């Protein structure tokens, strides 16, 4: 099984979901074992719990891993991006058959989690540019994605008035030989 790192809309097709995650956040090394709902801080030879995703009744029991029957309602966390204020995560319900991807943002300060259908993507409420799916984040709290010109053209055909003026007017100059567009946003 694979998780697409380029877009949540096709969330499970490219990157293996059974791989552990290791990243640096605020000078701390974080680790999450595949199919596990806990993020650990690594210091020296010790691992301490940093964050646990409380999936409640949707928690995927370890004894059911590999079983296709009666597992469609369980949720598995498949990817995480961490900024100083947020945890952006991808979860998958129905790991083996009826797959339904979600993305979530956990606000570390307010202790609130926001969940949405991953097929919707994130939308820039300032420019109303096309929905996108973050592939990386910065220590400053920004999320970034690369958008292919073909996808932008498709979106512009369906939304012609949005790029006429303002911050998106540069999109009128792109063509099929243009470089991908890097989108950087801050929640």
For each predicted feature, which ranges?
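Single conserved hydrophobic/aromatic residue that forms the stacking wall/gate
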Residues: 1-12
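Short coil-to-beta transitions that initiate beta-strands within beta-rich domains
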Residues: 13-24, 68-72
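Short beta-strand elements that form the blades of beta-propeller/WD-repeat-like
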Residues: 23-33, 37-40, 75-97, 133-154, ...
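Beta-propeller blade signature
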Residues: 37, 101-112, 178-186
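Short loop/turn segments that connect beta-strands within beta-propeller blades
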Residues: 42-46, 107-110
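Conserved blade-ending motifs and adjacent loop-strand segments that build the rim/top face
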Residues: 50-72, 109-140, 153
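C-terminal structural cap/anchor segments
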Residues: 78-127
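Blade-level signature of beta-propeller repeat domains, shared across WD40, Kelch, NHL, RCC1
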Residues: 139-187
């Amino acid at each position: 099984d694979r998780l697409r790192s380029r877009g949540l809309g096709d969330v499970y097709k490219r990157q293996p979901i059974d791989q552990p995650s290791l990243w640096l956040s605020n000078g701390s090394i974080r680790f999450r074992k595949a199919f596990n709902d806990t993020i650990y801080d690594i210091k020296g030879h010790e691992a301490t719990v940093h964050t646990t995703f409380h999936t409640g009744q949707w928690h995927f029991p370890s004894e059911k891993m590999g079983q296709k029957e009666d597992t469609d309602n369980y949720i598995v966390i498949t990817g995480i991006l961490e900024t100083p204020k947020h945890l952006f995560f991808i979860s998958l319900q129905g790991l083996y058959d009826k797959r339904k991807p979600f993305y979530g943002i956990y606000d570390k300060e307010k202790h609130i989690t926001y969940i949405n259908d991953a097929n919707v993507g994130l939308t820039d409420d300032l420019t109303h540019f096309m929905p996108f799916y973050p592939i990386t984040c910065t220590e400053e709290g920004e999320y970034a994605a690369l958008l292919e010109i073909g996808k932008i053209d498709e979106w512009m055909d369906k939304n012609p008035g949005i790029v006429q003026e303002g911050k998106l007017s540069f999109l009128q100059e792109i063509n099929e030989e243009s470089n991908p567009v890097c989108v950087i946003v801050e929640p």
